[in-house]
Every structure is written in structure tokens, then in C-alpha cells.
UniProtKB/Swiss-Prot annotation:
One of its GO terms (molecular function) is DNA binding. Belongs to the WhiA family. Involved in cell division and chromosome segregation. GO terms for biological process: cell division; regulation of sporulation. PANTHER family: CELL DIVISION PROTEIN WHIA-RELATED. It comes from Staphylococcus aureus (strain NCTC 8325 / PS 47). It comes from the Bacteria. Pfam families: HTH_WhiA, LAGLIDADG_WhiA, WhiA_N. Residues 274-308 bind DNA. This is Probable cell division protein WhiA. The keyword Cell cycle applies. HAMAP family: HTH_type_WhiA (MF_01420).
Amino acid sequence: MSFASEMKNELTRIDVDEMNAKAELSALIRMNGALSLSNQQFVINVQTENATTARRIYSLIKRVFNVEVEILVRKKMKLKKNNIYICRTKMKAKEILDELGILKDGIFTHEIDHSMIQDDEMRRSYLRGAFLAGGSVNNPETSSYHLEIFSQNESHAEGLTKLMNSYELNAKHLERKKGSITYLKEAEKISDFLSLIGGYQALLKFEDVRIVRDMRNSVNRLVNCETANLNKTVSAAMKQVESIKLIDKEIGIENLPDRLREIARIRVEHQEISLKELGEMVSTGPISKSGVNHRLRKLNDLADKIRNGEQIEL
């Protein structure tokens, strides 16, 4: 089962009172529902590919409106041959849509009805219904952080974005070919949203994975930084040894001033050690990294003069 499916499974088990059930149903039916006419009778069909979401729709409609609901199962004929679940009720169809703020004076509305988001709990319930209807979230173990809710209508996507941003989630929306999506990209905001709609088990799993990923990324950055520094140190040491060998060949290390002669010999004998360690091996007492670096630069400058055929003064 995918992370998103596990999360939806958890959300469908949340107990809600009648008002919050209506808010959740309002989102579910507005986003996944359709009204049809059969035998001169209005029929509500609410479609989903998630079995637990279908059971949730079934139980909420039955409980809140005390009407008969049936669940039909169809096989999807496209590439992914998943089941499609259709929750259908032929009773009080117009009354249900009126009460959920979906139908106004016989006209379908795309905006979120204010009566469905009167207080904090109802707003959370509406967002939960919206996620159950059209939401998806990437598995945090295998991909980048991304949560989105698909809406067929742009004005509803805008309303969702505004509703989510009332909780400072930094949600954004954009148009797609067959509708619009409202999405979150920041891991912290996704965590906040999971908590907001009651997905606490999903939140714990998401946070566990996020902590491990962040730690792994930090370690990788540290290793990369240390590797780069090591490569830089090795490259500098090789250049220093090359310069010292040239000096020894052309004028002899023994002819160098004492402080340059000693550091030259230590560097050739200990090519792998750092400037700090070089400074600690000087016989006259430890010298600083900058002091060691200054002497090695002198040797490099001297080697450059030899390469360029310049006059050497020791």
C-alpha cells in the first residue's frame, strides 16, 4: 500500500460529529460527485478509486441524511485497471446538495460555501474531505516532498489554496490540462497539513523519514566538504614536494636557510600530513599554520624562479 493510501485509510477512520461530517462530505461530493436524472428522479453519484474512501462516503451520507446508499464497483478500462467505486443515492438528492452548499437556487457552485467552513474544526474537515477526494502525497522515502489536491474547477482550487493558507501553509495552485492543483512543496508545511486534517500516524512516519533523510544529507554534505578539503590539501602538498625536489636538484636543499631547509625536509618525508601537523614537527618549537604556509610559499616562489630561469638569491 502506498504512503498516500495508508494516509487515506487512516483519515477515513476519524470520528466526526454531524457538522464536521457535512463539511467533509461537501468537499467529497463537490470534487468527485455528479448529479444525474434517472426515471424523472435526481441521482447523486460520487466516484473514487479508493475503497476506504468509498466506505467513508457511504457511511457519512447514510448517517447524516438517513438515506439509502449503494456502492457500485466498476473496472477501469485504461492502462491502470483499478476498481472504480461509485456511491449512489436516489433519495433527497437535491436536498443533500442544497444542505452541503453545493447547489444554490438550483445552480451548481464551484466556490467553497461559507456555511461548510464556519469554524476551525469544519475547515479541517473540509480539507480532509478534499484530500480524500483528490489528494496525493509522495512517499517521503523515495522522492521529493510533494503533496497536492486536484480540483476539476479552478475557482475551487483557488478556494482550497486560500483555505490552506489561512493556516500559513504556503500553498500554491496551478492549472493543469483537465483541472487545477493546489500543492505544497515544503516538508514542514506538509507535516503541518497532515496534522491539520488528523493524519497523525502518517505524520509520525513522514517525520521519521524526514529526520533520517535530513541526517543523511547532512552527513553527505560533510563528507563531500571534507573530501574536497582533503583533495585540496593533497594537491597543495604534491605541488610543494615537486617544488622542493626541483630546488634540491638545482641548488641543493642543504644550501637553503635553516628555517626553509627544515620545513622542506619535513614536507618531503611527510607528504600526507596537514600544515598544522607540519608546524608541530619543527625542531625549534611548534609554529602556526600561517607560519608553515609562509615558508612553503617561499619554497614555491623559489622553484618558480628556477623554472623561469631567474637569478636566485638565498
